[in-house]
Every structure is written in structure tokens, then in C-alpha cells.
């Protein structure tokens, strides 16, 4: 198999309602805040459990009883007040920008959003299609604690969509459900006047305990939208026709400020050339072919024999979750690596172990490299033998039939999501 370099060290070639925008933004950028350790305790098993629940993947032994204590965002320094956090008006209608202060860890990337003039910190999620926000009408008072709560009584632009409800179920452990409203929603200066937004009255503890996020902005395909009886458009779908291009980009970098940009592709944010990969959207996801892999070196490419051969690009998942065959092949090259179901509920290894890079197919013609520097998620500190134990950023899907390219993947690559096709394009970060 002949290989030649296309993107140095990163990509290698291989043989419903009618919401209206307030203004035509052309393009706009949202700079993201990263969770700090004071805002959210980095915990690999918890993040893996969230991903399993989201996609209905059976939990492994030891996961069900794993419940670490959440750490409130308000123990840190990122409490927001007043108007849109960090919002700037540059006097130009075609572009809005939001500034955020970076925090000390990049477990997950979050964005300021205003709904009905009220400020929130929310997660952009390319793995779902509902927008919902914590609110004053939730049944559980405990669930409200340490969140910014949307109050419909404080909004002059609130309107209830009579008869419409939403219900997101992430497996059987995580859910949010309730009525649906419309309100003015602003992200980075781009505004939709009547964005459909779920106001959950019931929220699972696993969502309520995520104190660093007040809700979610879904950016997957409309097919996944759970509003019934009439599906609703995502924020991006409502804006797409008014953008210069129907695209958005994700720049999620390790230890650095990240951003999403809607309507334009900033060539200064990536190196080399973009590689375009077709998306299969029949299930509503940004799903691409990914049936080949190699550990350490590109000259030992293997075909995944027992998996689906596809992967979902999901900014709402922190880890890289691949077919068990790939994960076992990778950790076979890491001295001391083991699957620990009882204590860590995942793959761990000595932190001083030498880690190889991982090559993954993106589409049928290219492979992406995930550098070894991105594949350690968490240091748990000394184990019984005094050696620090690390939790892998790469974990198994337990033969769950779904591979998930989460933030570990995005830290390696700049990604363009293009509704034309649809497709994604990838390149190394600049």
C-alpha cells in the first residue's frame, strides 16, 4: 500500500416552526471557555458512563455504582452575571464575537448563550439536535442548584408552543423532558427570534450534576430532534440560509482557547489542505466511514473485522470511544496497560509508560493521526505500587456498535461541518 504525505503528521492519503434571524450575520465566531478543575472534577469513568448512556451502549461491570461527587462551577471564578458574558458589539451586523476567559483544563468546551436576554453557559453538541436549558420550572429543587436558570417570566419575547414536548433519553440513565417554547436566542451576535427551546421539568441527576453547563445546543441533523408532534429546526439550521456558507467549524485545541465559527472557514486556523469526507446522515449524525486503524506506525494498517466501520463526530463527548478490537490492539502496545472494571471502569496504565500514536481512517481515502500526547485523559495519582495510574483518553465501546470521535479527536484536528452534501473536512490545527 503506497502512502504519501498530504497533511504533515495529521492526515495521510490512503490507496418546522418558522423562526427568523434578526439579522443576516454572514458569519460569526464564538470563543469558548474550558472547564476548570474548580468547575468540574476531571473523571474518566464518569465521562465514559455519560457517553455510554447517551448512545445506549451497555455499561461495563463497575460502572453502575460509580458516582463521584460533582464540584460546583461557583467554587471557581467563572460565575457570570449581567448581560451576555464577554459579549462585544463591534458595530458590524455581519459578524458577532464572544470573548471568554480560558480556564485551567479542557475537559469540555462551553459557550456563552443568551435566551430571552438571560445569560447561560451551554455545551455545543454535534451528537444531538435538541436545544434545552435549565429553568425555574424544573420539579426538583436540588437540580436547580448552581445553575443559571431560564425564567420565562423575565422574558418579553417568550412564547409557549402549545401541545409540543421534547424528551431526550440518553440510554436509560440520563434524560430531560418537558414543554417547548420559543424565544430570542443569541450566540456570538447572531440571533434567531423564535428558536425552539426545551424547558425540562424533569432532568436526570447525571445532567443536573453537571454544574458547569446550563444546557445544550444541538448541532446534529434535524432527524434526531425529539420535539413531538412536530420536529423543530436547530439553531444552525435556522441561520444557515443567511450565512455566507452553510458551514460551521470546530477548533477545539488542547490547553488553548477554542472556538466555533458559523458561515465561514478561517484558513488561519488550520495547516495544509482540508481533506473532505462524505457524511452518512441517515441516522441523523455526522457519521463517517472509519474501518481502518494502525498503532504507532502507518505501515501496519489493519481492517476492523467486528465493528460497524463508521464513527460519529461528537463534540458533546470528551473521550475517543472505538471498537473493542482497536482499543485492545492499541493498549497491547502500552506496557502495563490493563482493563480495570472494579476500580477505574476502563483502560488504565502506568503514567510513565511509553504511548504510541494512533492512526484512524477518516473516510475511505485518508487516515488521521491522534498523537500520543492527546491519549492520556487523567492522572489518578499513585497506585498500590507507588506508580501513578493514568486513565486513557481512548476507551472501548464494549461491542456497542458505535464509534464516537469525541474531544480527544477534535484536539488533533480542525473540523468543518458542511450541510452541503453533507460532509466534513479535516486538517491539522495551525
Swiss-Prot record:
Span of domain Peptidase A1: 109-427
Active site, renumbered: 125, 314
Basic and acidic residues bias spans: 87-98
Keywords in alphabetical order: Aspartyl protease, Glycoprotein, Hydrolase, Protease, Secreted, Signal, Zymogen
Primary subcellular site in the record, as a coarse category: secreted
Enzyme Commission number(s) of this protein: 3.4.23.-
Recorded GO MF terms: aspartic-type endopeptidase activity
Location relative to the cell: Secreted
Glycosylation (residues): 306, 352
Signal is among the record's keywords: yes
Presence of keyword Glycoprotein: yes
Top-rank taxon, per record: Eukaryota
Pfam family, one: Asp
Leading EC class: hydrolase
Propeptide: 18-87
Stretch list, region Disordered: 59-105
GO cellular component annotations of the record: extracellular region
Similarity section: Belongs to the peptidase A1 family.
Protein name: Putative aspergillopepsin A-like aspartic endopeptidase MCYG_07979
Amino acid at each position: 500500500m503506497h502512502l504519501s504525505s498530504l497533511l504533515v503528521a495529521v492526515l495521510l492519503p490512503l490507496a418546522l416552526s418558522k423562526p427568523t434571524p434578526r439579522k443576516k450575520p454572514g458569519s460569526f465566531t464564538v470563543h469558548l471557555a474550558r472547564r476548570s478543575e474548580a468547575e468540574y472534577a476531571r473523571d474518566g469513568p464518569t465521562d465514559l458512563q455519560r457517553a455510554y448512556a447517551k448512545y445506549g451502549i451497555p455499561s461495563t461491570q463497575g460502572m453502575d455504582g460509580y458516582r463521584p461527587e460533582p464540584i460546583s462551577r461557583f467554587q471557581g471564578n467563572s460565575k457570570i452575571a449581567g448581560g451576555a458574558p464577554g459579549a462585544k458589539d463591534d458595530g458590524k451586523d455581519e459578524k458577532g464575537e464572544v470573548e471568554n476567559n480560558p480556564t485551567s483544563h479542557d475537559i469540555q468546551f462551553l459557550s456563552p448563550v443568551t435566551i430571552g436576554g438571560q445569560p447561560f453557559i451551554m455545551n455545543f453538541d454535534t451528537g444531538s439536535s435538541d436545544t434545552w436549558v435549565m429553568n425555574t420550572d424544573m420539579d426538583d429543587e436540588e437540580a436547580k442548584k448552581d445553575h443559571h436558570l431560564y425564567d420565562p417570566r423575565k422574558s418579553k419575547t417568550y412564547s409557549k408552543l402549545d401541545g409540543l414536548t421534547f424528551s431526550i433519553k440518553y440510554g436509560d440513565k440520563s434524560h430531560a423532558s418537558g414543554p417547548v417554547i420559543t424565544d430570542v436566542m443569541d450566540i456570538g451576535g447572531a440571533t434567531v427570534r423564535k428558536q425552539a427551546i426545551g424547558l425540562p421539568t424533569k432532568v436526570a441527576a447525571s445532567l443536573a450534576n453537571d454544574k458547569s453547563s446550563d444546557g445544550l445546543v444541538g448541532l446534529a441533523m434535524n432527524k434526531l430532534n425529539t420535539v413531538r408532534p412536530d420536529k423543530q429546526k436547530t439553531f444552525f439550521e435556522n441561520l444557515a440560509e443567511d450565512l455566507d456558507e452553510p458551514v460551521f467549524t470546530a477548533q477545539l485545541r488542547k490547553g488553548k482557547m477554542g472556538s466555533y465559527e458559523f458561515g465561514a472557514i478561517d484558513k488561519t486556523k488550520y495547516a495544509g489542505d482540508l481533506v473532505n469526507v462524505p457524511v452518512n446522515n441517515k441516522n441523523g449524525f455526522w457519521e463517517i466511514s472509519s474501518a481502518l486503524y494502525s498503532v504507532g506506525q502507518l505501515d501496519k494498517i489493519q481492517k476492523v473485522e467486528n465493528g460497524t466501520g463508521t464513527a460519529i463526530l461528537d463534540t458533546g463527548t470528551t473521550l475517543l470511544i472505538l471498537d473493542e478490537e482497536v482499543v485492545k490492539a492499541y493498549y497491547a502496545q502500552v506496557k502495563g496497560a490493563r482493563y480495570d472494571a472494579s476500580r477505574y471502569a476502563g483502560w488504565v496504565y502506568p503514567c510513565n509508560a511509553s504511548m504510541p500514536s494512533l492512526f484512524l481512517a477518516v473516510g475511505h481515502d485518508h487516515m488521521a493521526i491522534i498523537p500520543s500526547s492527546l491519549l492520556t485523559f487523567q492522572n489518578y495519582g499513585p497506585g498500590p505500587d507507588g506508580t501513578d495510574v493514568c486513565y486513557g483518553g481512548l476507551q472501548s465501546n464494549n461491542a456497542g456498535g458505535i464509534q464516537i470521535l469525541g474531544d480527544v479527536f477534535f484536539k488533533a484536528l480542525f473540523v468543518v461541518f458542511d450541510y452541503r452534501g453533507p460532509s466534513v473536512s479535516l486538517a491539522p490545527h495551525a
